[in-house]
Amino acid sequence: MSWNLFKGGPKKQIVPKTVERDFEREYGKLQQLEDQIKKLQKDMKKSIEADLAMSKSAVRISSDLLGNPLCEPDVDFLQMVTALDTAMKRMDAFNQEKVNQIQKTVMDPLKRYSSVFPSLNMAVKRREQALQDYKRLQTKVEKYEEKDKTGAMIAKLHQAREELRPVRDDFEAKNHQLLDEMPKFYNSRTDFFKPSFQSLIRAQVVYYTEMSRVFGDLAQQVDEVQLSDAEREQENEARLAELRSLSIVADD
């Protein structure tokens, strides 16, 4: 939005430059805040969707393994995959609880806070329209003041001043209200969002505490023999070599 005086405007300074600078500064801070809130909403939504996709995918993988012929001949392997499936379902359940908590305590407040900005922007537009009306009528008054003071011109000047008065009062009321309330709204952001992000942190702490238990339980149920990465790779290569020795997979 442009705050420059329109061409052919009144000679009289309608709004002091210091007041206009204060207005631009306060409104600029709120515009920046609105952009930041929108970005935060977008990023939080992506994070929630990614969290849910991750846990749902993990459950699908463990369920697929349970129904895979790989598990049929080996009881120990089947027990391990069953334990994995149980762990993934527990993880998904806790993840859903975390997401529900974040939705209620973070996303919903963000949405409610964002809903205020359209009304704020509309109030600024009404203030700008009132300012333009004020300038237009002030220019009209000044034009008549410069004319010869004939009876007809004095009557026109009087009428123009009468038209100007309520328009000026309307602008000054709108301007004063915005200058008073915009800083209050901006300064309220910390008190409004602090509880939400405290809840976000608590939800994350609870979730990862539960995940520590879930995977701790899983670790106790799997094979206690731990192989290093090098040993595991060596074992896999040996098994793969055995498979390649079979005639059905031999190169022609």
UniProtKB/Swiss-Prot annotation:
BAR domain residues: 8-231
UniProt xrefs under Pfam families: BAR (PF03114)
Keyword hit for Hydrolase: no
Protein's cellular compartments: Cytoplasm, Cytoskeleton
Gene Ontology CC annotations of this record: actin cytoskeleton; cytoplasm
Main localisation: cytoplasm
Coiled-coil intervals: 17-57, 119-150, 224-244
Keyword Cell cycle: yes
GO function terms (MF aspect): lipid binding
UniProt entry keywords in alphabetical sequence: Cell cycle, Cell division, Coiled coil, Cytoplasm, Cytoskeleton, Septation
SUPFAM superfamilies: BAR/IMD domain-like
Gene Ontology annotations of biological process type: actin cortical patch localization; cell division; endocytosis; plasma membrane tubulation
Function text: Involved in cytokinesis and septation where it has a role in the localization of F-actin.
Protein name, per record: Bridging integrator 3 homolog
Gene (name only): bin3
